[in-house]
């Protein structure tokens, strides 16, 4: 992978990630294909929304279908018929989400399979081996996602163990002679000094990119902004910056304003299945009865297949009848909305008009523009 940085506007950055399988324009949003599929969508449909890269999940793909089946197909690209870049999460966050059915030790994580209750062990080495089998273009280190709330001492111990796991991830990645890219993950909770220590340790090890982890786990939005404003300027400028698991459209805007290059989140697809649709004027709840006889498109400013071909009344009808097509059309729209937002942000950075773009975005949503800390 090669990262090119073209221009900046304030702290926002416009560039691209260049892989053998294709180029990813940044800032970029990655749709989530947890089980090797963006729910309800074919790869061609996902690509048509403007997506350059997808996210897959190591933990879930390890449990089902498993490494052996993946290798029989070649890798995850061949298995799911997506011949463009793929980033895979290491499984650390999913293990964190298991709660009481997992035990974390220095060696790794012991847990019971959420599928059949089988006892399983996952460590940095195994995570690297699974991601090697997946053929991930971007591999993430295995880390512990620091919970919120956590005391400074708890966050320090978690972060320092993640640093040791980062070293083990790097060593195993190199032992496997994996030709792809490996990203480190900055931890440390809501404590700036711990974030500093984490980043320094990761830079000393050396990675192809740096992710900010442990945010969007329940902390106030102000804390997320504070940590991003503190840590992003310290990440090496020639490396991509990835904010994991974020988020709402306004979170993407605020992340870009603070120098983030990459995002992922299940929100556009999950919300689509629940009838919550993002538009240029805010969120529309399509199952609301006021849409029952509305012949207008979902969003007149959207160029997606759904908006060009169907009315709000039809989408309401599909939702009320629990038709699968409704979830699919909603997903197409939400993913396209996210990609159009990223396209707008990239264009604004290129032309030095980001402040105006951000002001228009919040005005259309009926909200005030959050302040940046100098």
UniProtKB/Swiss-Prot annotation:
Residues 245-251, 269-273 are annotated as: RNA binding. Homodimer. Within each dimer, one monomer is responsible for RNA recognition and catalysis, while the other monomer binds to the replacement base PreQ1. Its cofactor is Zn(2+). Its EC number is 2.4.2.29. Keywords: Glycosyltransferase, Metal-binding, Queuosine biosynthesis, Transferase, tRNA processing, Zinc. Binds 1 zinc ion per subunit. Catalyzes the base-exchange of a guanine (G) residue with the queuine precursor 7-aminomethyl-7-deazaguanine (PreQ1) at position 34 (anticodon wobble position) in tRNAs with GU(N) anticodons (tRNA-Asp, -Asn, -His and -Tyr). Catalysis occurs through a double-displacement mechanism. The nucleophile active site attacks the C1' of nucleotide 34 to detach the guanine base from the RNA, forming a covalent enzyme-RNA intermediate. The proton acceptor active site deprotonates the incoming PreQ1, allowing a nucleophilic attack on the C1' of the ribose to form the product. Zn(2+) binds at residues 302, 304, 307, 333. Belongs to the queuine tRNA-ribosyltransferase family. GO terms for molecular function: metal ion binding; tRNA-guanosine(34) queuine transglycosylase activity. One of its GO terms (cellular component) is cytosol. This is Queuine tRNA-ribosyltransferase. Pathway: tRNA modification; tRNA-queuosine biosynthesis. It catalyses: 7-aminomethyl-7-carbaguanine + guanosine(34) in tRNA = 7-aminomethyl-7-carbaguanosine(34) in tRNA + guanine. The active site is at residues 89, 264. Pfam families: TGT (PF01702). It comes from Shewanella baltica (strain OS155 / ATCC BAA-1091). It comes from the Bacteria. NCBIfam families: Q_tRNA_tgt (TIGR00430), tgt_general (TIGR00449).
């Amino acid at each position: 992978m090669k990262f090119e940085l073209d221009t900046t506007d304030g702290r926002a950055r416009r560039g691209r990630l260049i892989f053998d399988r294709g180029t990813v324009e940044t800032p970029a949003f990655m749709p989530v294909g947890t089980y090797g599929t963006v729910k309800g969508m074919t790869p061609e449909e996902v690509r048509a929304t403007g997506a350059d890269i997808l996210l897959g999940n190591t933990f879930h793909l390890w449990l089902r279908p498993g490494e052996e089946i993946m290798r029989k197909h070649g890798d995850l690209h061949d298995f799911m018929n997506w011949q463009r870049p793929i980033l895979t999460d290491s499984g650390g966050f999913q293990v964190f989400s298991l709660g009481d059915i997992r035990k974390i030790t220095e060696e790794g994580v012991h847990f019971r399979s959420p599928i059949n209750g089988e006892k399983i062990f996952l460590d940095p080495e195994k995570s690297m081996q699974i991601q090697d089998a997946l053929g991930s273009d971007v591999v993430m280190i295995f880390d512990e996602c620091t919970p919120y709330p956590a005391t400074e001492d708890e966050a320090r111990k978690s972060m320092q163990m993640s640093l040791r796991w980062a070293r083990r991830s790097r060593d195993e990645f190199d032992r496997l002679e994996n030709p792809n890219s490996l990203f480190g993950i900055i931890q440390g909770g809501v404590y700036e000094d711990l974030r500093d220590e984490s980043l320094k340790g990761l830079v000393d090890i050396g990675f192809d990119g740096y992710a900010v982890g442990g945010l969007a786990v329940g902390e106030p939005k102000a804390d997320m902004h504070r940590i991003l404003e503190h840590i992003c300027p310290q990440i090496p400028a020639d490396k991509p910056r990835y904010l994991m698991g974020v988020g709402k459209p306004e979170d993407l805007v605020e992340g870009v304003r603070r120098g983030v290059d990459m995002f992922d989140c299940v929100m556009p697809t999950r919300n689509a299945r629940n009838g919550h649709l993002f538009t240029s004027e805010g969120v529309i709840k399509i199952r609301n009865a006021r849409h029952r006889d509305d012949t207008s498109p979902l969003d007149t400013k959207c160029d997606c297949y759904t908006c060009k071909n169907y009315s709000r009344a039809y989408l309401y009808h599909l939702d009320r009848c629990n038709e699968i097509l409704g979830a699919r059309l909603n997903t197409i729209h939400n993913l396209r909305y996210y990609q159009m937002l990223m396209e707008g942000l990239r264009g604004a950075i290129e032309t030095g008009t980001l402040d105006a773009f951000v002001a228009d975005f919040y005005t259309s949503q009926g909200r005030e523009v959050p302040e940046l800390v100098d």
